């Protein structure tokens, strides 16, 4: 919930200040917690969560949350698992549609933060995030119990959801469906 506000159309200096530090700290803390229990990392994630709540309330969200809402209503999958599963796919889809140089830089920032946290090249950030998530036990949409027949209604519902209003690029329901199908496989 700190990555989407960084990329949203309604990002402000206030939300940027919250997200700029929270994103890399959140990645590092989550990576540690997936390997071992660590009270300091739990404290970090609590701080990141606070920053995320403040940032999303002020900047909005995007495609990941736009799709997670309808999918949660059409399945028993948890909101957090849906967002975690969808994040690398949403980053990839959004970035592929960006033409604005300033927004391209924001995506590069996220690539660099993820790459640093996972110890990979920024060019490999989205794929590495997807692979790390799966190695850490977060499966694809199918593994989360999302029925394939829920994908199209979710894409249609998301295309007009309030969470999509601040997405950095306009996405059609067909693009959302393609993204969901990739995340389901």
Report the location of each language-model feature.
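Alpha-helix C-capping/helix-to-loop hinge sites
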Residues: 5-10, 33, 52, 74, ...
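Carboxylate- and glycine-rich phosphate/diphosphate-binding segment that chelates Mg2+/Mn2+
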Residues: 1-59, 168
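Glycine-rich phosphate/pyrophosphate-binding beta-alpha loops
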Residues: 50-83, 161-166
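Predominant activation on well-ordered alpha-helical scaffold segments within soluble catalytic domains
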Residues: 1-4, 20-31, 46, 50, ...
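Gly/Pro-rich interdomain helix-loop hinge
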Residues: 74-150
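Structural motif
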Residues: 38-42, 76-78, 174
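Short, amphipathic C-terminal "tail helix"
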Residues: 148-185
């Amino acid at each position: 919930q700190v990555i989407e506000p960084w990329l949203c159309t309604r990002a402000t200096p206030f939300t940027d200040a919250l997200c700029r530090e929270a994103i890399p700290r959140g990645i590092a803390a989550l990576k540690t917690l997936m390997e071992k229990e660590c009270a300091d990392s739990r404290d970090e994630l609590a701080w990141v969560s606070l920053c995320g709540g403040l940032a999303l309330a002020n900047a909005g969200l995007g495609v990941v949350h736009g799709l997670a809402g309808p999918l949660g209503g059409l399945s028993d999958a948890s909101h957090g698992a849906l967002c975690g599963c969808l994040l690398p796919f949403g980053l990839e889809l959004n970035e592929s549609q960006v033409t604005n140089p300033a927004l391209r830089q924001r995506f590069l920032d996220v690539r660099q933060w993820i790459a640093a946290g996972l110890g990979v090249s920024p060019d490999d950030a989205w794929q590495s995030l997807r692979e790390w998530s799966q190695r850490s036990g977060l499966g694809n949409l199918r593994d989360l119990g999302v029925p394939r027949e829920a994908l199209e209604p979710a894409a249609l519902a998301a295309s007009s959801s309030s969470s999509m209003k601040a997405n950095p690029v306009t996405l059609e329901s067909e693009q959302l469906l393609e993204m969901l199908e990739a995340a389901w496989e």
